[in-house]
Every structure is written in C-alpha cells, then in structure tokens.
Amino acid sequence: MLQLVEFRDWHPELIDSVDWYFMPVANPDGYEYSHSTDRLWRKTRSGAKADQRWGKKKCYGVDPNRNWDFHWGEGSTSSSDPCTDDYRGPWAFSEPETKAIADFILTRKDQIKIYLTLHSYSQMWLVPWGYKNEKPKDYYNMYVLAEKGVEALQAVRGTDYLLGTAAELLYTSSGMVSNGSVNLTCKLRCTSHI
C-alpha cells in the first residue's frame, strides 16, 4: 500500500488502470487480542460458547479461515468444538468478518481478478485446493502467478517461500478463504503465510 501511495510515479499504470481494495485487518478483535493477551490467537472474539466436552468452560471465537462456505465442515481439520483453535463456527459465514468479506467480493466478482490474503506464521504461498489432494483446473495459471510473487519476495528480502496447495504443504482443510466459492472467479487466489 505504501509503495502505491508514496511511489506512484514509479508505476503510474498500476494506479491508473487497476482498482485496488485493501482490508488491512480482516479480524480486528482477534488481532487486538493477539497483541494484548495471547499472541498465538487466531480466532474471532465472538460470543462465548460452553465447552461441548464438559459444558463448563466458556470458549470464544471462530477460526475465520475455517468459516467460508466452500466445502465447509468437511474433513478433520475444522472442528465443531468451540474450544479448539480451528473451530469452524455453527455454520458457514456465521462470523460477521467472513460474511462482510464475502459480500464485498460478491458485489465485485466480475471486477476482482486477484485475491491475496496475508496470514500469520510460516513462509508459504498457498494456492487451492486445501480441502482435497487435487488441483483445480486453473492451478497452473495460479501457480505461475504466485511464483512471480514468491520470486519478487526472494529478490527483495532474500526469503525463501514454499509454494503449493495447502493440502500438499500443510494438511487438508475445509472452509478456507482461498477455496471460498465467492473467490472462484478470481484468476489468482492464494494465501501468503508470512
């Protein structure tokens, strides 16, 4: 963002020919909580739910990266237990954060060509699919575009990033933002773990 604003003259075509949408923090309450209380917190801070195992402990939040509608709730890496870090929520888009982002994208689905989300921890660029060990038909195109991003980071920072599907590099998981059905019209959908 800073480069686009402060160094506009370097690449004016990037400003003049493209509409840019930035959402600096998609989970503001979770972000604040991770800075004030628990630095590894990844969920939202939505209302407390009773622990399903014991019924006494109050558990907060939903993992926004398991709350998207595409194959929501499938597999073993999104939990129905509100006390786990990967709790998917009671239904897809149950969280106002994920619902707002999905609505924003849907109203611009014919305009948005690239959807990039920055995620915390690791040095990976993940492209779909994450919910299964298969690649979508546009995988090669996404891979080539993402590879350019990885190479640019390498050139500037000297940092190596792994590139592949979440299923290849991590594990299969459903309800992820980069797999979300609202993003299926984008030419590039990936998550950069920084």
Segments and roles (model prediction):
Residues 1-34:
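Short helix-loop-beta-strand segments that form the rim/entrance of peptidase-like active sites
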Residues 36-38:
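"Short basic amphipathic alpha-helical interaction patches in structured regions
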Residues 41-194:
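Metallocarboxypeptidase
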